[in-house]
Amino acid sequence: MYKNQLQELAQRSCFNLPAYTCLREGPDHAPRFKAAVNFNGEQFESPGFFTTLRQAEHAAAEVALAALARRGPSYSLAARILDETGVYKNLLQEVAQRVGAPLPSYTTERSGLGHLPVFTCTVELAGITFTGDPAKNKKQAEKNAASAAWSSLRQLVRQEASSSNEPESNDEQEQIRIARALLNYRLKEKMAMANNPHASPFPKKFPMQPERRTAFPQSSHSSYSKILPLFRPKSNSRSRPESPAASDAASQTPFRPTESPNPRSRFPAAEAAPYVPVGHFRMPCHSMAPPVTVRTSIPVFSAPPLPPPGARTQQLPPLMSHPPPIRMASPVRIRPAPPLFTPSAVQGPKPMMPVQIKDVQHQQIKETRSPVMPVQVKDAQNQLLKGSLSPVIPVQIKDVQSQPPKEALSPAIPVQIKDVQLQPRNEPVSIGKGVVPLPAIRPPVKVEAPAEVKEASQPVAGSSVVQCKADTSPDSLPKTQLKTANADNADAKDDHLPVDAEEVEDIIRHLELK
């Protein structure tokens, strides 16, 4: 409960959250805890030891809340809150409107190093310039300038109230009192300049006020080290006062401090650690940074380093000794490591042997080749072929007056073969006991060549009708026609079987009757 209230107060006051520290005592089976809380730079401890850490922290928070409640309203805390929220800029703008002066103008100057800049801002209000504390950024520098201007105007109000015997009214707003004091200040300046033109005008610049530092004791330590206050004493009662002569000498030579034989004069605290800040003996923001030593790694393919100077033999003085010889580094040998997935070595072209080629085509062909003419045969026995296609029979014709071709053969002559017997074969005659098939008689084939072939083929003599024998090779026929031809041959063999003489006479008589 108390921890939540203290945290809420810190958030409303724009402070950092309270930080708790714990002290543990006793054995492990029965520990004791004592807590302390840091609120806005102040330390509050619990009154005693507790069995749990939670109880100790709540007790420390309760002590902090009780101490803050007894103090009453804190003007320093209120000023800190206004400074964080930036209300002083609005207050200065309101005062400028009441006085009838232009709005305040801010001028910021940057100084310091590139990575650590320092901004200093000045604000001009009613012809008067106010300078604020330096800050790390421009926005905070403007807030500091507005706060310095407001504190300076409040000092002006107090000076005017002390000079005059008029009672100060607490009910009046502070902005109105500051505006009245600023108007009186400008009126007095005009009257003084009117009476004496050669008189010096009133000061137009108000630097930052020292009371602002006393009002915020923690702000001075925020920009410095947090360890330094722990080593320094809390009171200056043990420190030895310095004489004005020594202070003058120190001001003349700030970079050469004299060392005292007594170590306690340098460290006033008896039990303090010997802490001497280095920054006190050099100019701030203007000194050169110490050199940086970078340790370099030795490369892989480099010569071995030289031995240390202690390991070397004692050398003679430089005047008596010879100049050191020049040492050459050992040569570096790099062994190429081929990658794993490299292609195989490319083989060179194999030697070619010259070969002499004799052309055979130039020799004259001795044997004459007769032209092959495609012949189409129409078979009259349609029943035996049973729907099969008519075979195309290649016919070889020997020309009597053929001359040996020189380079190419004679063109092929298409020949159409017509069957002489166009009548279909009659059905077998049933005589006597059974059906006797007729013997298969192959008619002569008449070959007739077309007219174009007659004109083209001059060597052919005689009539255009040529008697040729159509021989069909079983390899040139398809399977279906081959089966049909085999069946016809089987029937022909059956027809040539020996029969009786009586049956033959009956067949002849029957044929004569028809």
From Swiss-Prot:
UniProt keyword Protein transport, yes or no: no
Function per UniProt: Binds double-stranded RNA.
InterPro entries: AtDRB-like_DSRM_1, AtDRB-like_DSRM_2, dsRBD_dom
Domain DRBM: 1-70, 87-155
One record GO biological process: miRNA processing
Pfam families on file: dsrm (PF00035)
Region of interest (Disordered), ranges: 195-268, 455-496
Record keywords: Repeat, RNA-binding
One GO molecular-function entry: double-stranded RNA binding
SMART domains: DSRM
SUPFAM superfamilies: dsRNA-binding domain-like
Gene3D superfamilies in the cross-refs: 3.30.160.20
Protein name: Double-stranded RNA-binding protein 6
GO cellular component: cytoplasm
Comp. bias intervals (Polar residues): 216-225, 249-263, 473-484
Stored CDD domains: DSRM_AtDRB-like_rpt1 (cd19907), DSRM_AtDRB-like_rpt2 (cd19908)
